[in-house]
A protein has these predicted regions:
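Flexible, glycine-/basic-rich loop-and-beta segments that form/coincide
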Residues: 242, 250-268
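Conserved class I S-adenosyl-L-methionine
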Residues: 89-99
Length: 268
């Protein structure tokens, strides 16, 4: 475990994303944050994936590779996997709302054996992913129509990142058919009532965000699912909306979210 302590060193400690930016290793702190989440930054020769990790002023910080994910959404799933301690090694994964494949690529880099990339659209999956033998491209497919027979091997893990439809209509049918771990991206702009959605589709009210998350938690409970983690997404939606990442499954959990604190952090 990396640990920097002691009087002078502790006094000079700073966030890793700040250190990467200030040392000129990237052109913005946001870029530094993405590189760290992507596993491209090491401290003292050890990879660190937490942007807030404290490093000493004289610590050896290095950027090992360029950021080359096919989509910015990759950083959302990376944050979730780390926050919720999800290990995808040799897993069969289901990527609902695959689009260009940001989540799909993260799953592969984290050791997934097979990824089923499901999307209602067509021709969106990045060429390098469509050509990867570990990826099964299931375009023009409505996730709500999937059954156990849709897959040779049932999924161990399922991510859900959908737009223009509420999770209320997507999660229940998936959870009823697949007994696996889930991580869903909760997007207030597609869950809130019309009165809560402002100009350009942005939901700004903290109260509206809290209502969305409360409703999401109640939906899980109604469907026999237990929430095991909830964090703000490290990357906002393309329209500027704050979003959330939730982990859940049929396995019982004693996790109780502090929704107000999560929303406050997301909107800060």
């Amino acid at each position: 475990m990396l640990n920097f302590c002691g009087g002078e060193t502790e006094r000079l400690a700073m966030r890793l994303d700040t250190a990467v930016f200030q040392r000129g290793l990237t052109d913005s702190r946001e870029k530094a944050r993405r590189l760290i989440l992507g596993g491209f930054v090491s401290v003292g020769g050890q990879v660190v994936t937490k942007p807030s990790f404290a490093v000493a002023e004289d610590a050896a910080v290095a950027v090992a590779a360029n950021d080359d994910f096919v989509g910015r959404g990759a950083y959302k799933l990376l944050a979730a996997l780390d926050a919720f301690s999800v290990d995808l090694t040799d897993s069969v994964c289901l990527d609902i709302g695959a689009s260009t494949g940001g989540f799909c690529e993260v799953m592969l880099r984290r050791g997934a054996r097979t990824v089923y990339a499901v999307d209602v659209g067509t021709g969106q999956l990045a060429a390098r992913l469509a050509a990867d033998e570990r990826v099964v491209n299931m375009e023009q497919t409505d996730a709500r129509t999937l059954t156990r027979e849709s897959f040779a091997v049932p999924p161990d893990f399922c991510s859900v990142d959908v737009s223009f439809i509420s999770l209320e209509h997507v999660v229940p049918p998936l959870a009823a058919r697949f007994d696996c771990r889930f991580v869903a991206l909760v997007k207030p702009q597609f869950e809130a009532g019309r009165a809560d959605i402002g100009k350009r589709g942005v939901v700004k009210s903290a109260a509206a965000h809290e209502r969305v998350l409360d409703g999401f938690c109640m939906m899980l409970e109604r469907n026999g699912l237990s929430l095991s983690g909830l964090i703000p997404s490290p990357v906002r939606g393309g329209d500027g909306n704050a979003e959330y990442l939730a982990a859940f499954s049929r396995e019982s959990s004693d996790f109780t979210p502090d929704i107000r604190a999560v929303v406050r952090s997301a909107l800060a």
